[in-house]
Amino acid sequence: DPADLEVLVEKEIVTVDLKQLALLTLYVDYQVREPEERAEDIYLYFSHYAFHDLHIEDMFHAGRENLTETEQFWNDWISLLKTKSGDTESRLLKEAVLYREGIEGLVKMANDNYKVHPSLYLEAMNEYDKNYGYSQIEKIGENAIEKIDSKLIIRSKIALKAACASSYLNHTEKLMLFCWESFRSDSTVRNLLRLFATREMAEQYGIRAEKALASRIKGNPITSIRNYELNQNIINN
């Protein structure tokens, strides 16, 4: 049982390279399962701590023999992860799509699957950011804020990322709009203050946002819970 082994390693009763052992476990499981069973069975291992941070593509290089029928596995793997929410699932889906289809494929996946994995938009933006693709980031941001529920906190993060891209492009109007949308989805004091960065922004959005925040605090003083992927999908009260 992987969970039992984790306890033994944690208590220093045995010394094992858990990552390598976990990869070998996936590698062997892949070999012994029928092709149509592999994706579902391998996915179950990721409920164990030792598997959380594994990259599925490393599984293919864990043993001496090349794994076969990989095309079906990747298709089944992506189809499965599209239906599963959570931090680990989102990461695995991102990595699988990037590995198979590149950034454009990741953007398409975000467009098709934003209700389950809205964070894929942000992941695609981060990939474009590595090569200073500010125009692509801005375009993704515009699309994302139209699609994603305005009450989801992940939408605020996406809007803020797009605002940074707009600042590099000197697109002032879009910068201000993204900052406003960021505030709408996560009405923190920090996001409010950002709307007062310039006189023009304060006049268009800042004063309106200040009134909205004051009204919200008065009506609901309880701070909403904020976490990462799982809580980014929680709609605020």
Model regions: which residues?
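Eukaryote-biased, non-catalytic alpha-solenoid scaffold regions
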Residues: 1-237
